[in-house]
Amino acid sequence: MEERPERLISEDGLRLDGRKPDEMRPLKIQAGVLKRADGSAYLELGANKIVAAVYGPRELHPRHKQKPDRAVVRFRYNMAPFSVDERKRPGPDRRSIEISKLSKEALEPAIFTEYYPRTAIDIFVEVLQADAGTRCAGISAASVALADAGIEMRDLVAACAAGKVEGKVVLDPMYYEDGYGEADVPLAMMPKEGKITLLQMDGDMTPGEFKQAVKLAKKGCKIVYKEQRRALKEKYGGD
């Protein structure tokens, strides 16, 4: 981690990148970026650059792993060795394995897995450039890739984090805020249904601050959801 800046929030309430506490970083999503995948998406959030690919539903081998009444969803989150400044060993580490598990659990409630018995739906998320918030960005990109693959879903899953920085609750923490902030609250939800599929808290917050963080993260999810829908509409037209 680079040296901590003197102040993360200025006296006039602005953050290092000029945002107000309740503002998100610039967000851009594109659907259908990989020809060989059944579904794919590219997402930029601030300096984050993420690609998601979906393969399936396809027959699951070995057969003893098949579920007779539903599809098995598998998720692999990976940070490219060149995605961060410090040297990263190739292959999954403990953090990547944990994020893969949580991301799968965040997305699975949205998928009609019962429509695809005895199959596997494989989701791969590759972080090409990391700038905090890659877990939420990966879930949001993967959701668009699932829709692009034509997989039946109850709703898209949109994800966004809030955090606590120098005593203030902020939306979508960036690199320094994530590294030097007091708390982080990633949240994923199906906005149409209002159902939360992932909610974590890492750090120290009062109950009031936590409530405020959840409210802010939900606001962020609605912004993400709008961009997810725009990306799919741009590719496919319609609603």
From Swiss-Prot:
Function recorded in the entry: Catalytic component of the exosome, which is a complex involved in RNA degradation. Has 3'->5' exoribonuclease activity. Can also synthesize heteromeric RNA-tails.
Name of encoding gene: rrp41
Enzyme Commission no: 3.1.13.-
Major enzyme class: hydrolase
A GO CC annotation given for this chain: cytoplasmic exosome (RNase complex)
Subcellular location(s) per record: Cytoplasm
Annotated disulfide bonds: none
Protein family according to the UniProt entry: Belongs to the RNase PH family. Rrp41 subfamily.
Entry annotated with the keyword Signal: no
GO MF assignments: 3'-5'-RNA exonuclease activity; RNA binding
UniProt cross-references to Pfam families, sorted A to Z: RNase_PH (PF01138), RNase_PH_C (PF03725)
Domain of life per record: Archaea
Keywords for this protein: Cytoplasm, Exonuclease, Exosome, Hydrolase, Nuclease
Protein name: Exosome complex component Rrp41
